[in-house]
Amino acid sequence: MSGHSKWATTKHKKAAIDAKRGKLFAKLIKNIEVAARTGGGDPEGNPTLYDAIQKAKKSSVPNDNIERARKRGAGEEAGGADWQTIMYEGYGPNGVAVLIECLTDNRNRAAGEVRVAMTRNGGNMADPGSVAYLFHRKGIVTLEKNGLSEDDVLMAVLDAGAEEVNDLGESFEIISEPGDLVAVRSALQSAGIDYESAESGFQPSVSVAVDAEGARKVFKLIDALEDSDDVQNVYTNVDVSDEVLAQLDTD
């Protein structure tokens, strides 16, 4: 069932992202800069940087912006910020667990913006560890179907360490351990299968089902959080059924 929630969230996000292209570009650029600083500026020797660059390219970030971010992170060019990754935890409407990943150069500003977004949209902050245990870090590769079946994808990635392939309606999501992410992505490339993104993320171990009204409230909270420049990713354990999804589509 988690596939449905992911699909609903992704579909909802895409609509919001179209109106926030500048914010999206800034977040993708930040990912590149941090990846280059952490693992070096050569994408061939730094899989995280490679994947960050590929994701930016898929989202039509100009090559010049990508290259400048890579250079800033690698120290080849001045101007890089001191980015810190901070995780915040909380609960949204209907008791939905929320994990908020920030990448910021100002911890106080990030904390304030997250707190305001949560409290204004039916959420509340939680103590560290009280929500995180409901999620596990996984390698997540997404790809458009393009006529492929679930078996086609499974055959390509099974030996590379893929744990499951989820049908998200218009796309597939491949789940693996984070350490197998590069192998899974490489297996797709070897099979000639194009993919949308490959990155580490958090998958919920337990999900919370919501009705249409609950889903709207959760999506509103996600939107408010993602509107902050400091928020890089928002993970929830909301479960949206096909029936509820159909109701949302008529909104």
Swiss-Prot record:
GO terms for cellular component: cytosol. One of its GO terms (biological process) is regulation of DNA-templated transcription. It holds the Pfam family Transcrip_reg. It is found in: Cytoplasm. Belongs to the TACO1 family. Gene3D superfamilies: 1.10.10.200, 3.30.70.980. It comes from the Bacteria. The keyword Transport does not apply. One of its GO terms (molecular function) is DNA binding. This is Probable transcriptional regulatory protein NFA_37020.
